[in-house]
């Protein structure tokens, strides 16, 4: 087996058993292991054992990337890392506390925005006629489908001729009122009903449509892992990544979704909600 290294800013290809010698000669203090193949990882680990016992830091590339970027490196992700890494904890206390806060905030949101809801409903009817609410099947936790509610921001039968397509940042199907609703995230308020029903949480990966889940699953590794937590009205990917409407964007967003799934906590939710509130109040973003 060969092992790439970069002493003194250059590049070298060495055998695994040469790693300790190279580390000592070049005074290397940390080795980052970026190897997905389980057999090769075992051989590299055996060679690094001597280095580790001498005080050399050995770091998995996925962990290194995560700390630098705030997302999980999909290209380097491997099953062993998922099994042995810290995080992805689902303590009963955290789940119960998160659910209790979801119920409280959803009820408060609907109560406090009730005058706004009536105005929005009237504006939609006057602008484009048709139904006020938009209903669509999405994929929830553990792959369970549910009906998501939003204020309708597009014209009726927007996909009648095209079939399922991703919504774009400057989507021509969006109505005049819909543009305002999207800018201030007002179209998302009815999802508080989804939160009350238990289909969603306030914070989590955005739920995707079954059509796109089926399309992305074979194209993006570990895609189904995003379904290990409840989907959310807002999420880590939504505040860290711009509006996306492609497979490449879905790939990038999944890295943020997995980061959230790993670090899900009340503190993490609070940070995301506060940043989302800033976006809503100042109309930044989508």
Predicted regions and their residues:
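N-terminal hydrophobic signal-anchor/signal peptide
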Residues: 1-114
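Short, glycine-rich, amphipathic interfacial segments at transmembrane boundaries or analogous
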Residues: 3-8, 65-66, 71-75, 134-176, ...
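Residue-level signature of the cytosolic catalytic core of signaling kinases
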Residues: 15, 89, 93, 169-170, ...
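Short, solvent-exposed positions on alpha-helices
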Residues: 42, 59, 187-190, 268
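Phosphate/oxyanion-binding loops and surfaces in catalytic or ligand/nucleic-acid-binding neighborhoods
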Residues: 50-54, 107, 126-129, 154-157, ...
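A hydrophobic, helix-centered structural microdomain
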Residues: 93-158, 194, 266-286
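A short, structured surface patch at a secondary-structure boundary
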Residues: 167-230, 272-280
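C-terminal terminal-structure detector
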Residues: 211, 220-286
